Regions:
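Intrinsically disordered, low-complexity segments
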Residues: 9, 20-21, 38, 43, ...
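Noncatalytic, solvent-exposed loop/strand surfaces
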Residues: 43-445
């Protein structure tokens, strides 16, 4: 928020005339004019925050006016690093604070750090109860959300908690597995909370009509619930479609569109991998009245047009862009994302949105996550390499590359005010991607 005191020239002239008549009035006006010139409360720009999974618009994209086009020969500098425990939840940043959610010594730990220095501001924890059946890491899978001075975390075993962003105190907590009789899934609970108005929404797969649940942000009380679907690993997204706010959720068996206000189901579109032990983790991508969805395990990709009761299928096929766990980004009519299963090797692809035509494919990167900043792709591979390349259908032409993390880096990163935040199995880093001449403008962060 920014507050300005504005005076017209005539107003100032009149007041100066009165000031000459009264020394008291003159002093008062001088003070007001000084206030008008000197007092401007800090304004958080759109580039300054990455407060939730996939960024401010929940689509993996952000405008960064101060992003460098070239990096130093030795690579971008690491401003600070912080030791982290198990988990796949990415960092989030709001008003100069960074939240990281991970598992350390038998506890799920929420840490708030100064985003500029990495200094710990507060931390909160509780006993970690999740046990993985396949030998994978047992830390949180979900990325937290920050909204209206609150932090929302969703643990691997279903502990849903609201924290005070300023102090770290626990505001309310819900054991969703106990309250809604949910399972733990093959690989734990992974939905990153979505804050929409006064509700925070989860894809939890509960019984008795509690497949998708909206909770009151202030109290944690249920505002609405819908479907009997089991949960997938995908996180919901909200958008204005058909003139109303809607919530789109990929459950275990379908893409479901709901009214954001009351949870009424608008449509269901069958969407399920053909094999049971599978992952559907990519968040729907909304482009105007169109919805792009993607999954691996023989599922493929579809472009739909929003319609009441049933979406129109524009195109749907498996050989285009089958996302395992990372959501694609869109720039000027072209999708950019990883195709294929992580353990089998993936290709980075560019796909024309309107036709589904593959423009180019780049193998050899294994798997990774793509972030769009302005017209640049920031590709974080699971090997920990950060690659910057123009978002262009003409081809994959990296301009910058640097090793910023060790293997394995699978959590979604954050990009805020020119700083790139990313984590590996045991390390969180803050990497400076600002243009050199923008450091002064970013110093007030």
């Amino acid at each position: 928020m920014q507050i300005r005191l504005v005076f017209t020239l005539a107003s100032v002239t009149d007041m100066n005339a009165h000031a000459r008549q009264s020394s008291i009035c003159g002093k008062l006006i001088a003070a007001i004019l000084w206030l008008a010139a000197a007092v401007t409360l800090p304004q958080v720009s759109p580039a300054a925050d990455w407060p939730q999974f996939l960024g401010p618009q929940r689509n993996g994209s952000i405008v960064q006016p101060n992003l460098a086009k070239t990096w130093p020969k030795e690579g971008p500098s690491t401003v600070w690093q912080h030791k982290v425990g198990q988990g796949f939840g990415g960092p989030v940043v709001s008003t100069g604070k960074l939240i990281i959610f991970h598992r350390v010594e038998g506890k799920e730990l929420v840490e708030c750090l100064d985003a500029t220095t990495g200094k710990e501001l507060w931390k909160g924890d509780y006993p970690a109860r999740y046990r993985d059946d396949f030998g994978f890491e047992e830390g949180p899978r979900a990325t937290p959300a920050i909204a209206d001075g609150r932090v929302f975390t969703f643990g691997a075993n279903g502990d849903f908690i609201a924290w005070d962003l300023a102090k770290g105190t626990k505001l309310w907590s819900i054991d969703t597995r106990a309250q809604f009789k949910t399972g733990k899934g093959f690989f734990g609970i992974a939905c990153s909370p979505l804050v929409e108005g006064n509700a925070v929404i989860l894809n939890i797969g509960g019984k008795d009509g509690a497949g998708i649940v909206a909770f009151d942000v202030a109290t944690g009380k249920v505002r609405w619930q819908a479907t009997d679907d089991e949960a997938s690993y995908a996180s919901p997204v909200a958008a204005t479609l058909g003139g109303k706010r809607r919530v789109l959720v990929i459950t275990r068996v379908a893409l479901v569109a709901l009214d954001a206000a009351d949870g009424k189901v608008v449509f269901r579109h069958a969407w399920q991998p053909p094999m049971s032990a599978s992952v559907s983790a990519a968040t729907p991508l909304v482009i105007s009245d169109q919805i792009f969805i993607s999954a691996s395990y023989g599922t493929g990709a579809s472009l739909l047009r929003f319609r009441e009761s049933a979406p129109e299928v524009i195109w749907s096929r498996d050989e285009v862009l089958s996302a395992h766990y990372a959501t694609a980004v869109l720039h000027e009519g072209f999708l950019y994302g990883f195709d294929g299963r992580q353990e089998q090797g993936c290709e980075l692809r560019c796909v024309e949105l309107k036709t589904g035509k593959v423009q180019w494919s780049e193998s050899g990167l294994k798997a990774g996550i793509v972030t769009l900043a302005n017209d640049q792709l920031l590709v974080l591979t699971e090997r920990g390499e950060l690659i910057q390349t123009p978002a262009s259908p003409a081809g994959f032409k990296p301009s910058q590359r640097a090793q910023i993390l060790p293997f394995v880096a699978r959590a979604h990163p954050a990009l805020a005010d020119g700083y790139f935040y990313a984590r590996s199995k045991d390390k969180l880093v803050c990497v400076d991607l600002r243009a050199v001449d923008s450091s002064k403008s970013s110093s007030a962060r």
